[in-house]
Amino acid sequence: PVITGQAHISGDGWKDSQNTEELLGTTGQKKGIEAVKLNVGTVGNQFTGGIEYQAHVQDVGWQNWTNTGNIAGTTGQSKHIEAMRIRLTGEVAQYADVYYRMHVANFGWLGWAKNGQDAGTSGYGYQVEAMQIKLVPKNTAAPGSTANAFKKAPPRIVNDMQIRANMYSSSTPYLILVNRSTHRVGIFRGWQGNWQSIQY
C-alpha cells in the first residue's frame, strides 16, 4: 500500500498529489499547511480499507475525523494546521501501521507518531509547514525517533515560571523555584537559558 496526499499551502493553494513518504508541504519558506487530502492505494487492490485523519486548526482546535480524499483543515480562512492524527481502517490496518511526523515553525521536525496519536503542537500557535507519512508492516520499527511527536504548551502560569527560571543559574543540573502567589513549587532540569520544567 502507498499513501498519497495533497497539501493546501498558505499563499500557494493546492499542490499536486504526491507520495507522502517524500514530503507534503515546504520547509524553509515559512508557509503553513492550511488543509490536506489523503488517499491510500494498494497494488492490485490486494487490501480493502482506507485512511482517516483529523486536523487541529488554528483558533478552532480538533476538527472531526474525515476520510479518504476529503479535506481536513480549512481553505480561504488563512488558518493553519497545528497538529494531525492519522489512522488506517479496514483490512489495511491489520497489516500495516501508519507513522507520521510534522515539521513545525520554531521547532522543525518533531518525532514520529503512529495510528491515531497526536503529532504537532497545541497551544503555541505554531503552523505545520510540512509532514511525512509512511506505512510500515504491522508491529515493525518506527522510521525514526518517536520522542516529542507532540508538544503541548504549558499553561500560562507554568510558562511564566519557566521564563523566570531561565534568568537564573545553578551549580547543579537542577533549579527549584517557589511561586509565592500560587504557593506552587517548580523543579527544572538543564542549565541557565535552557531550564526544562520536570515538576510543577
Question: Can you annotate each of these PLM segments?
Answer:
Residues P1-R156:
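Lectin-type carbohydrate-recognition ectodomains
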